[in-house]
């Protein structure tokens, strides 16, 4: 169960980094 929570957290953080990178590229 804990592994699933860590996986979700890592995916969320990577997604956040990707969104931030896209924002910096556009603006």
From Swiss-Prot:
Keywords: Cell inner membrane, Cell membrane, Membrane, Stress response, Transmembrane, Transmembrane helix. It is found in: Cell inner membrane. This is Uncharacterized membrane protein YohP. One of its GO terms (cellular component) is plasma membrane. Induction: Expressed in exponential phase, strongly induced in stationary phase and in minimal glucose or glycerol medium, in low oxygen, by SDS/EDTA (envelope stress) and by H(2)O(2) (at protein level). It is a single-pass membrane protein. The chain crosses the membrane at residues 3-23. It comes from the Bacteria. It comes from Escherichia coli (strain K12).
């Amino acid at each position: 169960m804990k592994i699933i929570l860590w996986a979700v957290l890592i995916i969320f953080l990577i997604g956040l980094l990707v969104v931030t990178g896209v924002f910096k590229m556009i603006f």
